[in-house]
């Protein structure tokens, strides 16, 4: 059994070693951790069985010796008068007790420790824990969830109950604190206090929570509350040196505030109201619109616009393959024209593509607009891989299908990109095409700019994960087996800035997509230029 478990563990290690860190960016890779942990539990249970068997032997020996020594000690000389008893005493002390010593000293934990030590090389890192915590906070902000809701696991579309303990919530707050995110530190440390006050058992103490919380509210400008929390901390732990120093510092600042002249009163009035904190100003100008659309709010699909949207059978410019079996086409938006196609990929094709892509998944990157260098970014949380037609016949088949549907050639298109989104996986608002003020992103390809995007949804998503267009007020929800298509460039070759779009954070579920980006070269006669710059 030990050999079997070790071999199985090593098989999982082989998978995990290819993944390396950043597990939180791909649910597909996190599933490997589930199975690895399951095997680790099996190894632990085997260790427990061995320890229990060993302890059972020791207990049996102890009980036997207790009965024997009680009898022999009651009449030592009478007991030893029997020569057999004398022999057995000598034998026990010379042979049996050393054998028991060997049993006690047996290190049955060695196998388990060896397995654990090997596997720890492939465990998630501090970066993963921080990334997963930030993902939960991203979901908290985007979908307006309070920490209590998340802690209770009350999320839409969930199949399994999952709750955060006091220690889990403390970990969330500490991760935020270490990132200098005092807004979320306060929210999560307050949740910790609520659960502690409710009587939940934990290793985390109120003193620890108040230590973080008092400094966080101070950083948010709430001096009065920082002082009150510090006093609470000292009432619980009078010997807390840092709290003592902070108390004196806060009292000094408060005294200086009280001594402000009337001319500076306006400044004092502008201080943060006690206990009320606002989310910091974000770097993304359209943040509010983007997040509203992710929640299904603010969609500008008016009745008038809806009347211009239709469903039809699409024959792909009368391609022979589609004349026999046309695709169902549905208008998602009128201008720019965004369409959805149904039954583009079968379940079998999807599973095969995921199977091929999974070993190749790596953290998705973005191209720095100033340097042109590919780099990871916090606003794109997913893993992706690129599939060639030689990888499997299904890739070539899907490529041909996209060519027939769009009427564009795939000869100059990019490889099929497969992406899997992790915890709170997202891709904030971006353009698929290269802008004039950037380095020529696609110069090395020699095929021009990205003229069109074909996005395949390869999974349903229980909650979240929409594709939204902030400038349009459009939101498109994932449906397994469907695909959406739009042109990134006007017929003049100029970029259509209305196509700025985003992949909303996945609230519940596992999101798989694949992208095919068509380029300008080769499309000259398939999508001719327009007569004006705005065509």
Curated annotation (Swiss-Prot):
Signal peptide (UniProt feature, chain positions): 1-21
Keyword Cytoplasm: no
Placement of TPR repeats on the sequence: 207-240
Single annotated GO MF: L-ascorbic acid binding
Tissue expression pattern: Expressed in the heart, placenta, lung and pancreas.
Protein name: Prolyl 4-hydroxylase subunit alpha-2
PANTHER family for the chain: PROLYL 4-HYDROXYLASE ALPHA SUBUNIT, PROLYL 4-HYDROXYLASE SUBUNIT ALPHA-2
Description of how the protein assembles with itself and partners: Heterotetramer of two alpha-2 chains and two beta chains (P4HB) (the beta chain is the multi-functional PDI), where P4HB plays the role of a structural subunit; this tetramer catalyzes the formation of 4-hydroxyproline in collagen.
The species this protein was found in: Homo sapiens (Human)
TM helices/strands, residue ranges: none
Gene behind this protein: P4HA2
Modified residues (N6-succinyllysine): 480
Compartments reported by the entry: Endoplasmic reticulum lumen
All residue ranges annotated as the Fe2OG dioxygenase domain in the record: 412-520
């Amino acid at each position: 059994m030990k050999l079997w478990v070790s071999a199985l563990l090593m098989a999982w290690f082989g998978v995990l070693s290819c993944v390396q860190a950043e597990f939180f960016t791909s649910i597909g890779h996190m599933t490997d951790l589930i199975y690895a942990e399951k095997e680790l539990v099996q190894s632990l249970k085997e260790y427990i069985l061995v320890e229990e068997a060993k302890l059972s032997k020791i207990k049996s020996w102890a009980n036997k010796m207790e009965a024997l020594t009680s009898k022999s000690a009651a009449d030592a000389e009478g007991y030893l008068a029997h020569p057999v008893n004398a022999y057995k005493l000598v034998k026990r002390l010379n042979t049996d007790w050393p054998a028991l010593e060997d049993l006690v000293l047996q290190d049955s934990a060695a196998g388990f420790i060896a397995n654990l030590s090997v596997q720890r090389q492939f465990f998630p890192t501090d970066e993963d824990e921080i990334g997963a915590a930030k993902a939960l906070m991203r979901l908290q902000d985007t979908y307006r969830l309070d920490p209590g809701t998340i802690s209770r696991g009350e999320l839409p579309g969930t199949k399994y109950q999952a709750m955060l303990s006091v220690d889990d919530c403390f970990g969330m707050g500490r991760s935020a604190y270490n990132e200098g995110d005092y807004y979320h530190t306060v929210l999560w440390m307050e949740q910790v206090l609520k659960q502690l006050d409710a009587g939940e058992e934990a290793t985390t103490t109120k003193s620890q929570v108040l230590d973080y919380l008092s400094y966080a509210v101070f950083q948010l400008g709430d001096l009065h509350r920082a002082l009150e929390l510090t006093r609470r901390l000292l009432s619980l732990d009078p010997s807390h040196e840092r709290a003592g120093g902070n108390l004196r510092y806060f009292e000094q600042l408060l005294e200086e505030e009280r001594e402000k002249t009337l001319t500076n009163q306006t400044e004092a009035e502008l201080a943060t109201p006690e206990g009320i904190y606002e989310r910091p100003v974000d770097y993304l100008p359209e943040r509010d619109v983007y997040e509203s659309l992710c929640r299904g709010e603010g969609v500008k699909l008016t009745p008038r616009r809806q009347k211009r949207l239709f469903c039809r059978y699409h024959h792909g410019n009368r391609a022979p393959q589609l004349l026999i079996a046309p695709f169902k086409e549905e208008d998602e938006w009128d201008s720019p024209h965004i369409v959805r196609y149904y039954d583009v990929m079968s379940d079998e094709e999807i599973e095969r593509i995921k199977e091929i892509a999974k070993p190749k998944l790596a953290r998705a990157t973005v191209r720095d607009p100033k340097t042109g260098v590919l780099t990871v970014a916090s606003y794109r949380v997913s893993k992706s891989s690129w599939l060639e037609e030689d990888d499997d016949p299904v890739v070539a088949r899907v490529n041909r299908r996209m060519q027939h549907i769009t009427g564009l050639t795939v000869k100059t298109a990019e490889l099929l990109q497969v992406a899997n989104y992790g915890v709170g996986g997202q891709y904030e608002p971006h353009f698929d095409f290269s802008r004039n003020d950037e380095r020529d992103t696609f110069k090395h390809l020699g095929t021009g700019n990205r003229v069109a995007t074909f996005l395949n949804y390869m999974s349903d998503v229980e909650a979240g994960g929409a594709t939204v267009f902030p400038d349009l007020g459009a939101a498109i929800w994932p449906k397994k087996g469907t695909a959406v298509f739009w042109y990134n460039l006007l017929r003049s070759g100029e970029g259509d800035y209305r196509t700025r779009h985003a992949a909303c954070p996945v609230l519940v579920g596992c999101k798989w997509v694949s992208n095919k980006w068509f380029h300008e070269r080769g499309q000259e006669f398939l999508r001719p230029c327009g007569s004006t710059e705005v065509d």
